[in-house]
Amino acid sequence: MPIATINPATGETVKTFTAATDDEVDAAIARAHRRFADYRQTSFAQRARWANATADLLEAEADQAAAMMTLEMGKTLAAAKAEALKCAKGFRYYAENAEALLADEPADAAKVGASAAYGRYQPLGVILAVMPWNFPLWQAVRFAAPALMAGNVGLLKHASNVPQCALYLADVIARGGFPDGCFQTLLVSSGAVEAILRDPRVAAATLTGSEPAGQSVGAIAGNEIKPTVLELGGSDPFIVMPSADLDAAVSTAVTGRVQNNGQSCIAAKRFIVHADIYDDFVDKFVARMAALRVGDPTDPDTDVGPLATEQGRNEVAKQVEDAAAAGAVIRCGGKRLDRPGWFYPPTVITDISKDMALYTEEVFGPVASVFRAANIDEAVEIANATTFGLGSNAWTRDETEQRRFIDDIVAGQVFINGMTVSYPELPFGGVKRSGYGRELSAHGIREFCNIKTVWIA
């Protein structure tokens, strides 16, 4: 079955690609497996030179990469360029820090009856990455940069609607100097993942995607006893308390909700506002959301572009329609736009009761649900009333309230007076059904290593 690039702003097919055959996939795995034998022996200094050269190319080609991303999945050009530059930063971070992050960890040898004892980090081998379309370069680089700097080799199975981004990443890594076979893109369907992951030459996997996709890959990896990192969905809370800077909170709330056209696992989705400031927040928030310009993502004046897929747009529309039918109030937006492409307007919904699906579920589009909380206890209760636990945000100047949110929100991340963002320097991941394992920081690179205990008499 062909793999197509479809412009979500028009719905038109731009380019089609032929999927890899079983023999081509087998050859790619064999090439990676052979390459690992010598690549793992390369020095950190050599890998760092290749990583920095890759970063140089990403920076030099940021405009071209941005245009490609925008064409394939609809994010605005500004957001796409920022993503390309962030990828360069990710490669540079691991180029600079990998050797220190993976240094031997000495133990007190005398206490274990040895002359020397330590833990040594060693690469796992061939790693399969199953990546989504919403951040087509950054999500893959969050895997590629640490995995390669640790001495592993990678196979990328990207979402089928972003083939050009997937091929570009393998190309830019090769042009950066990494040897042939270190990083390969496989243009295959999701149905091919199981056979690849079960192949004994593949040592581990990482997946960013939906909960069902994570369950599938997690089950296969569990059966094969292969280490896996899963970063799945999120229904992130954004709490606003009376002591917060309200205007700053509203501004950040808008950005947090519509970033990437609302299609981010760490986008703020459920806005939980203290009753004392609820009306003021809603008025300001609705006004700002309604004023956003929806349009051509290549237009620099556009704030919100199309959703990446027609199915995604239809799912968002149905979630809003179901909420309205159940009694929720649509404060702005809420209707499909009569134009080509897969656009959906910024939408704010209030009066959501606990029995509505929207109370807990994730909406992957520019739709904000706003909840009223009588006190901090109720704010925390609503924040945790979801099966997900990826990111979270809380706005308050009160240090006691800040500590409460840090301690009691069940999530992999909490941002106080800001919005959840991924940084190379900070661990990224979730709890509950948002997955397990961590990306980025020291934790992310160590996920791709075996720590070997060394004891010398």
Swiss-Prot record:
Q: What class of enzyme is it?
A: oxidoreductase
Name the reaction it catalyses.
succinate semialdehyde + NADP(+) + H2O = succinate + NADPH + 2 H(+)
Q: Name one Pfam family in it.
A: Aldedh
- Active-site residues annotated for this sequence: 231, 265
Q: Kindly list the positions annotated as binding NADP(+).
A: 133-134, 157-160, 209-210, 232, 362
Q: Record's superkingdom?
A: Bacteria
Any one Gene Ontology MF annotation carried by this entry is: succinate-semialdehyde dehydrogenase (NADP+) activity
Alphabetical GO CC annotations of the entry are: plasma membrane
GO BP annotations of the record are:
tricarboxylic acid cycle
Q: Which UniProt keywords apply?
A: NADP, Oxidoreductase, Tricarboxylic acid cycle
Q: Does the keyword Chaperone apply?
A: no
Reported EC number(s) for this entry are: 1.2.1.79
List, alphabetically, the InterPro entries matched.
Answer: Ald_DH/histidinol_DH (IPR016161), Ald_DH_C (IPR016163), Ald_DH_CS_CYS (IPR016160), Ald_DH_N (IPR016162), Aldehyde_DH_dom (IPR015590), ALDH_GabD1-like (IPR044148), GABD/Sad-like (IPR047110)
The family database entries (PANTHER family) matched by this protein are listed as: SUCCINATE SEMIALDEHYDE DEHYDROGENASE [NAD(P)+] SAD
Similarity comment = Belongs to the aldehyde dehydrogenase family.
Functional summary from the UniProt entry: Catalyzes the NADP(+)-dependent oxidation of succinate semialdehyde to succinate. It is believed to be the main source of succinate semialdehyde dehydrogenase activity in Mycobacterium. NAD(+) can substitute for NADP(+), but enzymatic activity is three times reduced.
Q: Which NCBIfam families does the UniProt record give? A: PRK09406.1
Name used for this protein in its record? Succinate-semialdehyde dehydrogenase [NADP(+)] 1
Q: Which organism is it from?
A: Mycobacterium tuberculosis (strain ATCC 25618 / H37Rv)
Gene (UniProt): gabD1
